[in-house]
Amino acid sequence: MPCHGMMRGIVQPCPGPRGLAVMTFVSRSRRAVLGLAPAALLLAAMPSAQAADAADQTLLNATYDVGRELFSEINPLFVAKWQKEHGGQLKIDQSYGGTSRQAQDIIQGKKADTVTFNQVPDIEILVKRRLVAKDWASQFPNNSSPYYSTIAFMVRKGNPKNIRNWDDLARPDVKLVFPNPKTSGNARYSYLGAWNHAQEQFPNDEAAAKAFMGRFLGNVENFPTGGRGATVAFAQNGQGDVLLTFESEIKSILAGKEFKDQGFELVVPPVSVMAAFPVAIVDKVVDAKGTREVARAYLEFQYSKEIQQLLARHNLRVHDPEVVAATADQFAKVRLVDPATFPGGWEGIQKTHFASGGLLDQLLAAGRH
């Protein structure tokens, strides 16, 4: 590119395909070389130009829509570490967007070496297209999930609608904002959190569970394609009473300067879904580019204590025991339910809820009549 658990350095923004944001991370050493006079640069390059060219690598990581701040910190750290240990030049391009959309772009030819997604099904789509290995989940610890979060609620100052639990989200006086589950992993977890609540409230009454979901979805005021759009709709445009998103995202919003004067508040329901953030190597791409070693090291880096601590600072729940113990007071107590334990696992969830003509489509269609 020229512009380039619990229960059961420079950043250059570039236009990406289909509106996806792409960021480029370049090392300080590379900037230093670029600043050399042409003659000096030529003399320095002459003895080993072929070797230097062979060592230069570019990695493209495709990730979820609200991952900008996190990966803008992770990527320069990894670039510095890799170049110190291996030499040569490494550049990381970063693509952001709803992960379902990202997966489709990879299927259509986007050359992502790695994916750091926020839901398993979008990696499984790549497995079915033989872009990712079938055993991807066993290639890294914790089912290839370096960190996780949960779905929580962001409400307006003083919590005027007294939102406490999933039941409150189905009340007729409450309006919701969260992304479209067809395009966003974030939104699928929000939907599944509501579905889990309905199943626990009405364990033997499918009709009552569906009725609850109908009321819940009927309260959605805005269905953006990704998490960032949902945040803008709620926080900047004033839409809705409740924003459903990752706990980590809400905490980042509350700690940031952009919306601090609005006094938003975090509500963590007593029960919610565990939102794993799975990672994988896109085998077909790394084999073609010769980047498997650096791609694997990049994902392994996210399990290092340094990055586990960084993840916790970004309000993400992690697996490293020492970091977990040190940050225990940072996170609300919540019973987390893993969607993988739902009937049929993620494959069953996809077929039942999110496939064309599935329960989500049925409920949305019913709400329009």
PLM ranges: what are they?
Residues A62-Y64, V155-R156, K175-F202, F216-F223, ...:
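Short beta-strand->loop
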Residues T150-N159, A276-E293, L310-H314:
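A bilobed periplasmic-binding-protein/Venus flytrap-type ligand-binding module shared by bacterial periplasmic
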